[in-house]
Amino acid sequence: MSARPYVLAETAWPALSDAGVTVAVLPWGATEPHNFHLPHGTDTYQSDALAAEGARRAWERGAKAMVLPTVPFGCQTGQRDLSFAPGLLPSTQQAILRDLAHDLERRGVAHLVLFNGHGGNEFRAMLRELQPGLRLHLLLVN
């Protein structure tokens, strides 16, 4: 068994076949400069760590939560001229979110918590557009 059975990337398939996961947590960061003192992965590292801690606490209280692998690319159109600040368009983010939500819903997940770690990611309008077409409940943590 994984030391963190609530983190998908660290969990082997046999443990997942009967896990009964009802809550999926999707950390979403960005890869961009943070002045001279912080690494490009700051937004991703923070959202990943905070999502895992939240899932740990939920797991300890009996919730069947699972943290999905963190999406490391955000929307940072204002940093397109900076070296190695790869980003996604909002339409690409929405397509990723839509596809994952439908896939998770098909697998019986009841709630998808989007854990946003980057100020340039604007998910509220996307969630409002996607929610009516889903049985799965979308939640946003900014």
Q: What kind of region is each of these model predictions?
A:
Residues 57-63, 132-137:
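Short helix-capping segments at alpha-helix termini
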